[in-house]
Amino acid sequence: MKRLLLLNACLTLVCAGVFAQPKLNENNIPEVVKAMTAEEKALFVVGIQQNAEPYRGKYLPGTGGVTYPIPRLGIPSIVMMDGPVGIRLNDNETTCFPTGLLTAASWDRSVARRIGEGIGEESLDMGNDVILAPGMNILRNPLNGRNFEYFSEDPVLSGFIASAFIDGVQSKGVGTSAKHFAANNQETNRLDADSRLDTRTLREIYTKAFELCVQHSQPWTVMASYNYLNGTYTQESRELLTGILRNDFGFRGLVVTDWTGRRNTPKQINAGSDLLMGGSPSQTAHILQSLENGTLKMEDLDRACTKLLELIVKTPSFKGNRPSLKPDLAASAKVARETATEGMVLLKNNGALPAKPARAALFGVHSYCMIQGGNGAAWVHSPYIVSPAEGLKNAGFKLDQSLEKLYTGYAAFISEDLKYNHKVNVHVGDAQKPELEITPELIKNTALNNDIAFVTLGRISGEARDRILKRDFLFQENEIKLLETVCEEYHAAGKKVVVLLNICGPVETASWSDLPDAILCTWLPGEEGGNAIADVLTGKVNPSGRLPMTFPLDYFDAKGADNFPYQFVSNKANESAVHPERRGLPLKDIAYTDYSEGIYVGYRYFCTNSKPVSYPFGFGLSYTTFGYSKASVKVKGQNVIASVTVTNTGAAAGKEAVGFYVHAPLGSFSDKPSVELKEFGKTRLLQPGESQTLTFSVPVRQLASFNSEKSRWETAKGSYTAFFGADATNPEAEATFKVASARNYSATRACEPQIGAN
């Protein structure tokens, strides 16, 4: 009997050893990976789209994707949702915050952080674990369809605004996904276009923002983009994802692919892609085949599984979050309104603003039907949209009822017409609304009965297609005619005209900017845009936004402007130019794009070449004035410490954005930009006569330029000039400092061009 009991005990111990299964926690990830079968690993690293069987109906419609659960090991699914200005769901209402462009125009990290916190809070309410944002590609060209979603033409402004957004979201225990890495700067043929650029340009312009946000904020994930980079898909580039991102930048999180299955699966994993989204059964099968034939090593698959598990244990889903599906929309709306005011840019003001509540005539369909945000992954199903008309009424203006009735009826009709018009093809969201023709007689009559006129001009864009020069950058003849007639009649009556630019990116202004008395760039300001616009127009909030990109006089003034599909409209007739398997001879700017301007993107080109622009990078007016004094810059160890005192010299309370620009000696380089932004900040609200000293600390390493031949960063020895002031062309104060000896910093040799850019 004793022998039988002993045998049973031994069998129990053996079985326990064989069949014991670890349950995932923060401390046993290697053990869990070891316990996973090859099939489970192959399923695990391939994402699931929310409408795929057997998951259809389990997740909220519009969910971006989920991960594969393994219940026996305690591994849950986690949820990923768009987007950068609020959670994108098909049916559930969430807050539409201001777009990335407006956020960057605030030149204020706290604004980006508040928006991030708001999106993080709503993520918890809606059961989201990772928000697929921020989008932070450089505004290489004014016509990129997703410029509204991104931040700036400058990598420092982009990187630090992104970092603050990431800090805000992740402070709520929700992950982020910095995207799209890297050199993903056009929507035309976005799945297969080859971005061709030298490594100096890649490092100084197109990956610098990612470097800064990784080193300062460590996003939980980075999203690898669709495009080729110098002949290799970014998702298959080990040099990019492992060499640059992990080894050089120190990224510790997970690399997720942008949503496509048309890549070489083992190459993606070998390169450093950890989670393949949106996922398909064929990818899982390909992984298992690759393990068998040796094209994929188990150690690389284990690395991907490890990174995904490291992400999962941080998520709300793993920690037992119970989503309410009832976000605090009122609290978020307050944040949306307040942050929107911070990034609106006053471009012109000849005594028209601030305006007191009065009788007002509002022209332009977007005065009554405001564009809150763009299309695609950044579209948000918000509970409402406050138009400029509603915002001005809320502020006490009495609107011209004949115009209001005419425009609201037209807006309702055209919205319904566009909704069912098969010719309108947008990824998700709204469509551009054509302007209504208003007779000169009606305009003249309104000038007699109103005290001020507002004309709203709107432009929308979105994912999957770029803007067109003649249709989007230039205003149409009927729009200009409307503005001309309104200005003529109202000026004849001794009354002011204010233009509101409800726009997704730069537009041509030089041909008409002399007509109105004031121009306020409101961008795409989110659901509370109308109230925020009224706050700025009335002086309740003093405008403090500054342009995060240059507004050129002419589209072709920018170097490299012709190396972009500025007049390409996708249709069946030109599909052979887009898809690689159907290409005859690859078409320039569609199959590939030469970044021929090199590092001279935006203000770096215009300032270095003293080329005139409509409005320079960093430009923006205020209802008050500021003075600068006590500029000082010193090198202390590994950092440059700069400070300047800003004083409100005007009669109204206001905030001042301040850029810290540097002109560097050439060192071993034949050319460098005349100025480059290295840091920025914003004062608190200063009362008249009040001062504040802003201090910046910049690593000496951030003064460096990238030497492609030697694959290293070089900070030159010698005398540097520092400039203070947001406007890149108009410094308010300056100081000099010296770097006593040259300093070099090695970097991975990676992503070198295979074909020279033209």
Predicted segments with their positions:
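Bacterial Sec-dependent N-terminal signal peptides
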Residues: 1-23
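Glycoside hydrolase catalytic-domain context in secreted enzymes
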Residues: 19-705, 712-729, 750-758
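Short beta-strand elements
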Residues: 731-747
